[in-house]
Amino acid sequence: MDMKITFPGGKQVNAEYNGFVHKTDQPLAAGGGNTAPSPFDLFLAALGTCVGFYVLSFCQQRGIDMAGIELRQAMDRDPQTHLIGRIDIEIVLPASFPEKYRAAVVQAAQLCMVKKHLENPPKFNLFTTIR
């Protein structure tokens, strides 16, 4: 699994992976052009969309209509470290959602691989090479 990181200009940094180019930029206040999400915004979106995928798959496998289902993700920053200390993901279900599946849809959402990697982080190795 290799990803190529490129620098197209300004504060933009792109990731080329699996046939896609994931573009990032910084907000205007940080000197960027605000032409794409920031890397941290993509990180948070990856978590939410991953959990959303598992909720979607759960419902599709059971023929449950997705109308009225949405996720809300809220992040709380630690005032001392300025890092996110807690992430709450609320699965909003319509009144028509089958009661017997309420706990099970949460269990399905727990399977998200992005969430699992945050709970069990990999080791990082940053280094340089000269070409």
Describe these PLM feature segments:
Residues 1-45, 55-131:
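Extended beta-strand/beta-hairpin segments
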Residues 47-51:
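Alpha-helical metal-binding/catalytic segments enriched in His/Glu/Asp
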